[in-house]
């Protein structure tokens, strides 16, 4: 019995020494050039075009053979995808979609997915704090690749979503040499809206930083996405507050019925739209969506910002022109509800004339555009005020390319409620000319009524306008 006990003790000591030995070897493998990489918790999976879903091969800082084992392409660019906060502790469905789109656009590239799921699954404030550690991990990985393999950070493009955008920014601020580009996909707002630049994404974090803001609804600091500009170019699709196809009414109803337990699902639509807009730019390179620089979304809604002079317009997404101004450029555009998201923007200007002073508020209209390729009919718009002898400018957009404009129709829609005054007499204005500017082509056209002036009456038939025959008018508009 005593000999058996001694044998068991000896066996236990031997097993413990074996485990310690193996752990020591594993630790030794991750000490390279005197640098200890064992504190890195984030994982770096090099996904392949054949398998965009699974993390089958990991690049391990400090383990040089891991890079060869994963068939890293040293002569091509590298995309590093950093996910955001998660409730489930698992990757969301957009990750493989973005990986696949990146490989489709850049087949020879490396697409690395950063796994920080264990840290991202904590309560939001805790996960937000972890972005600093994740950023440090990513920066250490990039610097290690630069030192060990002479892989230039200028070949690296970081793409971060939500909290991942700030982790990308912190990584960019910590690398010894700047990375080429960081794309922030609706960077998280809470805990970051008022944070100093070193703790969040900022223009100094890469040679070029572009940002998409898609869910900034709410007061500053409480909106899901950050409201203030944090890049060289900040684009606010549909004003950045809420995206078409995302039902705000349904979201409010579900929160009222179920509480905030399903808030992760509710915010996904507009928050994640930033990712799908970028994916769209990768897959539909022939027709990039165009955004326009503007001081405010209110001015953009009036159609006052459809200029492309002096870098005032830019492509959304992958093919963006890398304009580095001293101040962040805030840009706006409209989109469709589904991919492809591109629309065609128009500024419309018209003067309402009359002999008697008359003012109406919140008036609904419809405009139809007819072009050489297609037409877009009954586009609704509302003017907050319509007054005699005043000129109004507003923005409309079409979901199809109608080609060169040939003709338009304008209708003043009657009120949905019954009005005795409208029953006896319908208000109206004279409109002589309508000026239209196409944002995508930058062409301007002036339309005239078939008579000298067209009388537009509320609730009556549409009025037709055709291209003015006076060449001097259209020459001035060019």
Swiss-Prot record:
Protein EC: 3.1.1.34, 3.1.1.32
Q: List the disulfide bonds.
A: 57-70, 246-269, 294-313, 305-308, 448-468
Can you give the residue ranges of the PLAT domain? 344-467
> What does UniProt list as catalytic?
162 (nucleophile), 186 (charge relay system), 271 (charge relay system)
What residue spans carry the region label Essential for determining substrate specificity?
246-269
So which residues are the signal peptide here? 1-27
Topology within the bilayer: Peripheral membrane protein
One Pfam family this sequence matches? PLAT
The alphabetized UniProt keywords are: Calcium, Cell membrane, Chylomicron, Disulfide bond, Extracellular matrix, Glycoprotein, Heparin-binding, Hydrolase, Lipid degradation, Lipid metabolism, Membrane, Metal-binding, Nitration, Secreted, Signal, VLDL
Q: Where does Ca(2+) bind?
A: 197, 200, 202, 205
Name the SMART domains on file: LH2
Spans annotated as Important for heparin binding = 433-437
Q: How is it modified after translation?
A: Tyrosine nitration after lipopolysaccharide (LPS) challenge down-regulates the lipase activity.
Please tell me which top-level EC class this enzyme sits in: hydrolase
Q: Might you report a single GO cellular component term?
A: chylomicron
Catalytic activity line of the entry: a triacylglycerol + H2O = a diacylglycerol + a fatty acid + H(+); a 1,2-diacyl-sn-glycero-3-phosphocholine + H2O = a 2-acyl-sn-glycero-3-phosphocholine + a fatty acid + H(+); 1,2,3-tri-(9Z-octadecenoyl)-glycerol + H2O = di-(9Z)-octadecenoylglycerol + (9Z)-octadecenoate + H(+); 1,2-di-(9Z-octadecenoyl)-sn-glycero-3-phosphocholine + H2O = (9Z-octadecenoyl)-sn-glycero-3-phosphocholine + (9Z)-octadecenoate + H(+)
Q: Any known activators or inhibitors?
A: The apolipoprotein APOC2 acts as a coactivator of LPL activity. Ca(2+) binding promotes protein stability and formation of the active homodimer. Interaction with GPIHBP1 protects LPL against inactivation by ANGPTL4.
Q: Glycosylated where?
A: 73, 389
Q: Where is this region: Interaction with GPIHBP1?
A: 35-56, 446-470
Localisation per UniProt entry: Cell membrane; Secreted; Secreted, Extracellular space, Extracellular matrix
What's this protein's family per the entry?
Belongs to the AB hydrolase superfamily. Lipase family.
Entry function: Key enzyme in triglyceride metabolism. Catalyzes the hydrolysis of triglycerides from circulating chylomicrons and very low density lipoproteins (VLDL), and thereby plays an important role in lipid clearance from the blood stream, lipid utilization and storage. Although it has both phospholipase and triglyceride lipase activities it is primarily a triglyceride lipase with low but detectable phospholipase activity. Mediates margination of triglyceride-rich lipoprotein particles in capillaries.
Protein's recorded name: Lipoprotein lipase
